[in-house]
């Protein structure tokens, strides 16, 4: 199918369909969605969740306490927002059941650039997936999306409708709009003259989906929400005639759907008054002497915390506060999820194919999240950040607390302050374009750009110092460690084999040392007494600064003996035990004399050296670095290593 046929097919599928009232009622018998409220239809569009048993994944089990959590495919690109999405779905479920939430404003509260607008756009987009049914008369559709049920009286007609068509009583009770009341009068009470149109909600055409934004005190009045008289029609109709009214307000257009109020609490208070009755009673008054207008939809509002705090602290606004269902949308606090956000943003730009050195997105993610976290008590903020990503630090940081302990101490407002994703993405844009020749990103340029930007933003001194401390105290040393490993592993061709040899030798020496036995090397025949074994073990332990060798050796040997039982008597992989892996890596790379000629970009004295250097660069490029980045990062690493 070519693009033109595909487009036509889509256009035809979205066309309105007209029914008689009798046909509509017959449809109601088979299809609940014909009379479902806005929250029910939105739930249908969201679809069923994928249930994830976090007990099966160690990382998730630490974050979600082994709970079974729901993940919704409709929100799969909203990373790290499980709690907010679950609260939105909970609101919709309760509203769909006709509970108190049906009468409340769904209010997304969060910091700038935290994803509130994106969530609102997704909800509006989902609302387009399920059609609505609207009254029509003489070929004209109701301007306020009157549902056909507005024609029926709950007291008089509910029993018959329930008996004949299976329509529950609670779906009746929506008032008739002045437009529908006038047509009913013209038809002499004959409701069969009405038609019912199946319409697809549309953001573009503002059908059942509307958006309103705050203006200033002088130029915004309630007509933005409720509409006003259309002056052009006064030539033909009286001022209080329903046909003289322009139903252009957001509440008029959003009936049976969703109305988004952007930065709601920036609007003048007088503009918000119609929302009180629209939510609580399902109707509101227009600006002229016409009867009340119906509203049976969702009001979705969002704003930043500062506006909410100002509004909440004003005693005159108590009536509003009781009608608001708050969903907090904080910044993402998990490194792995923040990285996915950056990747998503990059994929929607020209930079999607630009080289990005390993560790760049991780480093920026760490910086952003450190800025959002509250300082913990008696623990490092860097450890807290790692715990928030689901890591277990019991072997590496004895002071680290559990995820829940950190959360409890931080309180409910954690993640509502700090650097936004927008700020981070602007930084990333500058990093990719830092080099005038090569469009690529690497952490060294990232450090430079971040330091510059912290100065330019003119943060309060204490905050700026805190951000610089994150850079110089945590991120730069950690990255130096990371790039050191990258360089060293690329340098050692038989890295894995060499590491395994040291591991096996260490375990053998430690085992004989613990048993206080001599050991004879089967390859060389050399005999090691307990003192010699201790000396050999210390050669491996000292570069890593092991403070209690006796306990460490016992711990390693016990681990290996247990592992052998499940591994056909063979030693486990040398990387399987984090503590010893770190010790071996430090031992392997403690001697840099051989390393320097290979990784430096100076002129080489022999073809052998040149070949080793070229092989090293090739292996680094296989890891995801460009040739230019290999040079930059090696030179930076050597400078940092020398200065430390």
UniProtKB/Swiss-Prot annotation:
The keyword Cytoplasm applies. SUPFAM superfamilies: P-loop containing nucleoside triphosphate hydrolases (SSF52540). This is Serine/threonine kinase YeaG. It is found in: Cytoplasm. Disruption phenotype: The deletion mutant displays an overall compromised ability to survive sustained periods of nitrogen starvation. It displays higher metabolic activity than the wild-type strain following sustained nitrogen starvation. Absence of the gene leads to increased expression of the toxin-antitoxin systems mqsR/mqsA and dinJ/yafQ. Inactivation of the gene leads to shortening the lag phase of growth during transition from glucose to malate as the main carbon source. It also affects phosphorylation of several proteins during glucose to malate shift, including AceA. The gene is yeaG. GO terms for biological process: cellular response to nitrogen starvation. It is an enzyme of class 2 (transferase). Autokinase and casein kinase activities are enhanced in the presence of Mn(2+). Mg(2+) and Ca(2+) are 2- to 3-fold less efficient than Mn(2+) in stimulating the autokinase activity. Its EC number is 2.7.11.1.
